[in-house]
């Protein structure tokens, strides 16, 4: 029966004390397994509960083959004492769903998870493309800032943010660069690097993955960076507008919106024309009513005068008076 093992050790670059064995995972009759390494060699964090160890969140420092079928993973403790996830805040406040706390435009931090490599005990390392139940290359990964789009009982829709300038972002309306006013005094953003919102990568995440950004508390006297559970950090007005445009572009509705705006403009123009015509009609109707009143008045006057003239003119009927009037006209 073939056996392989993964051994976990402590690592501290500032401490020359011998490394400590934290735990061992043994596998039997298994040819390969996923290990916390990635092709880009970016930092990876794992959650592991070792017997007798209080820390459960670790940073992977490096992974090495020790001998045949034995690999070592060296870890350093990650301080999560200040981390408070949205799910915890919801529980404390007895709020049923995330929408009661985070709103559209809120800046949050999301644990998207990591992309692992596959360790084959005979052939070595390879990508994890044949493990579709895990994160794959090209998918959003690692802890990063994001923007809340909406939230309900099913989860929170977010747009991830990256500091890596996306290819062709100047021509891609689904990507926009954030204003510095949106990101200032948030430790997860670097001052000297621009930040881009990737609206085309919108996705739904669980509240258990979300925590508030570590932002400077301008209301306190010490103005320290802390994770404020009120989630008060939001996009600027301009960035909110850019978010709306980016989301429309991401689902192919930017052109439809432009057409809709054109149609709305034409509707408003026609409405204004109709209002003007209604005013003209109202004015004409008023003038017509005045003319009709004047006509009725003149008609009554003519009838009275005709009767008076009939008595003294020698005419025997109104018809003969009409004939006389017609001769004068």
Regions found by a protein language model. Give the residues of each.
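Active-site substrate-binding loop(s) of clan PA
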Residues: 90-92, 122-123, 135-137
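A mature extracytoplasmic/lumenal domain signature
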Residues: 114, 160-162, 203
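Short, acidic Gly/Pro/Ser/Thr-rich loop/turn segments
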Residues: 117, 165, 204-207
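C-terminal terminal-subdomain/extension
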Residues: 1-104, 173-329
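Compact nucleic-acid interaction/catalytic patches
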Residues: 132-143, 148-185
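A short secondary-structure junction signal
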Residues: 119-122, 158-160, 169-171, 209-212
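Short coil-to-beta transition motif at edge beta-strands of beta-rich domains
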Residues: 3-4, 33-35, 99-132
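Residues in well-ordered beta-strands of folded domains
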Residues: 109, 159, 198-200
């Amino acid at each position: 029966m073939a056996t392989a093992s993964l051994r976990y050790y402590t690592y501290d670059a500032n401490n020359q004390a011998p490394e400590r064995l934290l735990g061992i995972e043994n596998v039997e009759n298994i040819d390969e397994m996923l290990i916390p390494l990635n092709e880009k060699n970016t930092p990876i964090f794992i959650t592991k509960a070792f017997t007798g160890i209080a820390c459960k969140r670790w940073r992977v420092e490096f992974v090495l083959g020790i001998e045949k079928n034995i690999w070592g993973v060296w870890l350093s403790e990650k301080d999560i004492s200040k981390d408070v996830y949205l799910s915890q805040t919801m529980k404390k406040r007895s709020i049923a769903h995330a929408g009661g706390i985070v709103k559209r435009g809120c800046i949050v931090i999301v644990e998207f998870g990591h992309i692992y490599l596959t360790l084959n005990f005979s052939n070595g390392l390879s990508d994890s493309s044949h493990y579709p139940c895990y994160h794959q290359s090209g998918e959003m990964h690692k802890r990063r800032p994001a923007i809340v789009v909406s939230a309900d009982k099913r989860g929170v829709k977010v747009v991830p943010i990256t500091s890596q300038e996306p290819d062709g972002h100047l021509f891609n309306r689904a990507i926009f660069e954030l204003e510095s006013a949106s990101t200032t005094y948030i430790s997860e953003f670097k001052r000297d690097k621009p930040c881009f919102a990737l609206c085309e990568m919108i996705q739904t995440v669980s509240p258990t993955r979300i925590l508030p950004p570590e932002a400077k508390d301008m209301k306190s006297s010490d103005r320290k960076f802390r994770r404020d559970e009120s989630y008060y950090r939001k996009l600027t007005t301009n960035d909110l507008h850019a978010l709306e445009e980016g989301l429309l572009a991401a689902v192919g509705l930017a052109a439809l919106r432009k057409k809709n705006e054109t149609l709305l403009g034409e509707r408003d123009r026609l409405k204004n024309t109709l209002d003007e015509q209604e005013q003209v009609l109202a004015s004409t109707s008023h003038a017509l009513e005045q003319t009709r009143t004047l006509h009725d008045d003149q008609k009554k006057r003519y009838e009275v005068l005709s009767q008076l003239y009939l008595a003294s003119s020698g005419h025997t009927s109104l018809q003969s008076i009409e004939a006389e009037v017609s001769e004068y006209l």
